[in-house]
Each structure stands twice: as C-alpha cells, then as structure tokens.
Design a protein with these regions (language model features):
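Active-site loop/oxyanion-hole signature of alpha/beta-hydrolase fold enzymes
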Residues: 22-25, 67-108, 112, 116, ...
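Flexible "cap/lid" loop of the alpha/beta hydrolase fold
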Residues: 118-123, 127-159
C-alpha cells in the first residue's frame, strides 16, 4: 500500500488551501512547499488534486507545488450551463497562478490535463517555463479525430465510465490503488464527465501553432505507439518524450519515485 503511505506523509508537509475565481466559480487549489520554481499539477478527466498525492511530499522538498481542482472536479465549482472547454480549464489554472502570485510556472498535466496545459501555454505563454505531459497528448493533431466517446448518461453511462477507467489499469496495478482511482473518478458528476470529455473533442485544439517552451512527455508502459517526434516538434520544437515500463495510465501513482526523478531532472534544467 505504497500510495497510502505517501498520502499519510503528505500531511507532514505544510500545505495551504486556497480558492481563486473564474467566471464566478470558486477554483480550489492547495499550495505546499517553497523554492525557486513553482509547479502547478493539473489532473485528468473526472479526477481531482488527490491524483498527485505521491508527488507533493517529494517535490515540495525542493519546489513550491500547487495542485488544482479544475472546474466541475473535486472541490471546485462547475459551470451552471454545463459548458466546459479547454479555455475555461486554462483560465482556471491562470486564476490559481495569479492568486499564488507566481511569475513563471512549470505545468504538469495528466491525461486530459495535457491539452489543458498546452492551451494554457497558448493563452499565457509569458507565464510558462516548461510543460510536462503525463500519458496525455500535448499535440492534439495526433489524437484520433474520429474518436467517439461512449454515451455517459444514466446507469449505463456510469457502467461505461467504470469500463473506461478499468481499461487504464494493468494486471500489475495494485487492487487498492485501482479502487482509489475508481472511487475518485466515479464520484465526479455526470455533467462533468460529459462536458469535460466534450472539451477534448474541440477541433480548435488541432490547429497548427507553435508552443516554443521546453516540453517533456512521460508515457505509460502501456502506450504502444508514441507520437511521431518529427511531427510533434513542428508544434513543440523543444519536445522530448520518454516511457516508464510496467505502468498503466496512472503511472505517477504506480511508480512515483521514477516519475518524480524525471520531473526533477526536467525542472532543474529550466530557466526562470
């Protein structure tokens, strides 16, 4: 139960909860640690800031670490009209950055959090020192354009969500960790599951633009075909990628020490 010991340890490190605001919605975040670099950790679809429980204690020894709940997730407010978008998510992250009075930040995004941090870099390039994607696409041009998510409404929709989540595990994913992830993701409201999924289908995310800051993608061991480096570097010229063998989609939970070392090595090379 390694992940549980990490969660317990996280309470030893001083943390401060904050609430920023975007479009009248309260955006929850937690700040831990201090240091020359500020890392903002952005969770994935129907997840919340607890996704990063295995990162915060280790990274906060060296950096200021901010975990955020995106709109409609965790303890953050949801849009009353049910309209979610990558712009809304990116602006929520910016509200958190501004509230924290951080100048430049390193953004770490898991799964759906990867296109969120890319969109943030489009909207607020002067605020970004670097990007780290965790088993998620920074270049949505390479994301399957014909992807059709299953219906997510009603009891059958909940079953579909559970099936999607279980497909993210490997036989080596500890059962207690599987249950933790299932509980976290299935408690997200139906409107959030539908709206956040729809936000990833926006054709505007596939535009040919350049994001010049350093970027690292860390892929799960189950990712069978990594993005084409030459094509990706047309959009992200300072893009690098690596893979963590023996992991599923939640690789930062499954092999936290290895993942944390990759983060530190990347951040320590950045200019602030």
């Amino acid at each position: 139960m390694r992940w549980l010991s990490v969660v317990v340890l996280s309470f030893v490190v001083a943390a401060t909860a904050s609430a920023a605001s975007v479009d009248g919605l309260n955006i929850h975040s937690t700040t831990t640690g201090a240091g020359p670099a500020t890392l903002v950790l952005v969770h994935g679809w129907t997840c919340d800031e607890s996704s990063w429980a295995a990162q915060v204690p280790a990274l906060a020894k060296k950096y200021r670490v901010i975990t955020v709940d995106l709109p409609g997730h965790g303890r953050s407010g949801a849009p009353a009209n049910g309209k979610f978008s990558m712009d809304l998510f990116a602006r929520a992250v910016e509200a958190v950055r501004a509230e924290a009075r951080a100048d430049k930040i390193v953004l770490v995004g898991h799964s759906m959090g990867a296109p969120v941090i890319r969109q943030y870099a489009r909207l607020y390039p002067a605020r970004v020192a670097g990007l780290i994607a965790v088993d998620g696409p920074l270049d949505m041009r390479q994301f399957p354009g014909d992807f059709k998510p299953p219906a997510l409404t009603g009891p059958e929709g909940l079953k579909a969500r559970e099936g999607m989540i279980r497909s993210m595990f490997t036989p080596q994913t500890p059962p207690d960790l599987q249950q933790k992830i299932l509980t976290m993701m299935l408690k997200a409201p139906e409107a959030t599951a539908i709206g956040a999924m729809g936000s990833m289908m926006d054709p505007a995310l596939r535009k040919d633009d350049v994001t010049p800051m350093p970027a690292l993608a860390v892929w799960a061991g189950t990712s069978q075909q990594l993005p084409n480096l030459e094509d990706t570097r047309k959009a992200l010229p300072k893009y690098e990628q690596t893979q963590v063998p023996g992991t599923g989609h939640f690789l930062m939970m499954e092999k936290p020490d290895e993942f944390n070392r990759l983060v530190v090595a990347f951040v320590d090379k950045l200019q602030f």
